[in-house]
Regions:
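N-terminal first-folded block
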Residues: 1-31, 35-36, 40
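An amphipathic, aromatic/His-enriched active-site/gating alpha helix that lines ligand/cofactor pockets
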Residues: 23-31, 35-37, 55-89
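Glycine-rich beta-strand-turn "strand-cap" elements at beta-sheet edges
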Residues: 40-48, 75-102
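Short, well-ordered beta-strand segments in beta-rich or mixed alpha/beta enzyme
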Residues: 1-8, 37-66
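Short acidic, gly/pro-rich beta-turn/loop elements at beta-sheet edges
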Residues: 15-17, 48-50, 62, 97-100
């Protein structure tokens, strides 16, 4: 399952936000078998526009993830930093990786 989160962060709190995000992602990857990867990018023209590509083993893994204490801690920590949040559920069309050609 691929989910995209588009987040507008208060630019004055961006560094603090990135610390909280990194802590949450690292914990999730370490302790949740169904959390497969995170990719985080920022808009070059506006670094406060963050896009996170989240990959989960399945819907159940995502639903379990949002109930964890580390995710709830992250949400509480960033609630005053996040100015807007858009979550986009996606359907994978294709994924090609370098390792596919070895």
């Amino acid at each position: 399952m691929y989910r995209i989160a588009k987040i507008k962060v208060d630019i004055n709190q961006l560094e603090k936000y990135k610390v909280a995000l990194k802590e949450q992602m690292n914990t999730a990857i370490k302790v949740e078998p169904g959390v497969l990867s995170y990719t985080v990018v920022a808009d070059k023209k506006d670094l406060s526009l963050i896009t996170i590509i989240e990959v989960y083993a399945n819907l159940e893994a995502y639903q379990s993830h949002i109930l964890t204490s580390h995710f709830k801690k992250y949400k509480d920590a960033v609630k005053d930093m996040v100015l807007s949040l858009e979550l986009i559920d996606t359907e994978l069309i294709e994924r090609v990786h370098k390792d596919d050609f070895k």
